[in-house]
Amino acid sequence: MGDYWLNEHDNIVKLINSLTADIKEYSIQQRNNPGIVQKNTPAKLRNGLVHITNEILRLQDSLTYGNNRNIQEKELLRRKNKVESLISMKNQLNSTLDAAINNTSQKNELMGNNNGVGIGYSNRQFGKPKETEATKQFDNQQLFTNQQHIMREQDESLDLLSQSIMRQKNMAHAMSNELDQHNEMLDDVEIGTDAVSMRLRNANRRMETIKQNAGSTCMIVCIVILIILIVVLIATDSGCKIYNDPKHCP
């Protein structure tokens, strides 16, 4: 199984590349055929950038507050550099998105809106704004009610966004806790491995001592056997033959 942190880093890089392609496509459509561009496209692109920012912060927090005891200092520094690179990419992406949106706004001001305002004419209106067809039949109370309805919809959208962020936060905490548990298990395994290694080293030292003692014992036994053999030879006919002396004959 691959490293979880590196997998998350690769996923963020994919998100950045995907959003970069979306911004480029948005700019091309605004330049060539602005009529097919949806009005909520800038908001979607901005939300994508916010999501990437949150993912980078979560990845950065895992290095700052996570359990990194099993990561070497060199690898930890390399991962911090990767996060800095992601932040630079995100900032560049933010500048690109701002430029695309600002160019769109400036073009709309220069060229006019899609309701037939020609080149060189501003869509600025003086005096009372033109009433829309949707609110034309409303009285003051109905306008107030409609405005409250719009505000409630905006509040509901914000609540949904807040709930989504909270779910992501809870998921991040759950993954962090799970990683801590895995790290604790790995620490236990490492401690057990160290204990077994120490026992093996002690056993090897004992074996070496036994080998040395066995060698000394064998030498002593051999000397004793030789002495006994010499005594036996002297006390038997073999001694008489060896010395060729009647004194050594039984």
UniProtKB/Swiss-Prot annotation:
<keyword id="KW-1133">Transmembrane helix</keyword>
<feature type="domain" description="t-SNARE coiled-coil homology">
    <location>
        <begin position="148"/>
        <end position="210"/>
    </location>
</feature>
<keyword id="KW-0812">Transmembrane</keyword>
<dbReference type="GO" id="GO:0048278">
    <property type="term" value="P:vesicle docking"/>
</dbReference>
<dbReference type="GO" id="GO:0005484">
    <property type="term" value="F:SNAP receptor activity"/>
</dbReference>
<dbReference type="GO" id="GO:0000149">
    <property type="term" value="F:SNARE binding"/>
</dbReference>
<keyword id="KW-0472">Membrane</keyword>
<feature type="coiled-coil region">
    <location>
        <begin position="73"/>
        <end position="100"/>
    </location>
</feature>
<dbReference type="GO" id="GO:0006906">
    <property type="term" value="P:vesicle fusion"/>
</dbReference>
<dbReference type="GO" id="GO:0006886">
    <property type="term" value="P:intracellular protein transport"/>
</dbReference>
<dbReference type="GO" id="GO:0012505">
    <property type="term" value="C:endomembrane system"/>
</dbReference>
<feature type="topological domain" description="Cytoplasmic">
    <location>
        <begin position="1"/>
        <end position="213"/>
    </location>
</feature>
<feature type="transmembrane region" description="Helical; Anchor for type IV membrane protein">
    <location>
        <begin position="214"/>
        <end position="234"/>
    </location>
</feature>
<feature type="topological domain" description="Vesicular">
    <location>
        <begin position="235"/>
        <end position="250"/>
    </location>
</feature>
<keyword id="KW-0175">Coiled coil</keyword>
<dbReference type="GO" id="GO:0006971">
    <property type="term" value="P:hypotonic response"/>
</dbReference>
<dbReference type="GO" id="GO:0031201">
    <property type="term" value="C:SNARE complex"/>
</dbReference>
<comment type="similarity">
    <text>Belongs to the syntaxin family.</text>
</comment>
<dbReference type="InterPro" id="IPR045242">
    <property type="entry name" value="Syntaxin"/>
</dbReference>
<protein>
    <recommendedName>
        <fullName>Probable syntaxin-8B</fullName>
    </recommendedName>
</protein>
<dbReference type="InterPro" id="IPR000727">
    <property type="entry name" value="T_SNARE_dom"/>
</dbReference>
